[in-house]
Amino acid sequence: LDPNTRPNTKFNKDGVCFACENFNKEIKYYDEIDKQIVLDKLIKKHCLKNKNSFDCIIGVSGGKDSTRQALWVRDKLHLNPLLVCCTYPPEQITKNGADNLSNLINLGFDVLVTGPSPITWKKLLKESFVQGNYLRAPELALYSSLPQIAIRYNIELVFWGESPAISWNDTKTLRNEPYDGNALRNSSTLKNCDLNWMNGIIDNEYKKIPYRYPTEKEFTENTIQIIFLG
């Protein structure tokens, strides 16, 4: 059940949300071969330029879904991925979470774990709550980590799991192609990635770096392409 008070939601004349509409279309018209052809073209465009780098980045939590994605990209697509996990140890990581990441490492993956300062995190989490969206700061750090690292490592292709538009009706993240994730900055939580709300809470600009989502210009200059696998 999705209320119409949720930001960026969209319903048709029958009261069905965009995510449910899309689900019904996928069930009816799903074509795995078609999707594979599109994916192969994107891989050829973004992954075959620099053999001294990883082919792509995959955002992982270490859970069952991201483990499956990592194995699928490596073993089915035959790519060499760098796995990236944004976390907040020790207070936000469970033993199961640590074991899951260890499992990915034991499966032979290169895994990069990044975590912003816990002190900064707590201040921003509180301010996010006061301003009415307690997930804003954590999701800024989470979603910023992948394209930031992609730019630093000269990697063009970034794989995420599910599309916010197709999975939970955040339609402002939608672009012309359903797999295209380059409009994530428009999600209801990220709100175009403006950091001015942190002023007065975080005084040192360098402390904001983990929360700075790369600009559209940076995406274009570095040919960054986010793809939803979900």
PLM features: residue spans?
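Nucleotide-activated chemistry modules centered on ATP-dependent adenylation/adenylyltransferase
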Residues: 1-57, 72-230
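Short, glycine-rich nucleotide/cofactor-binding loops
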Residues: 56-65
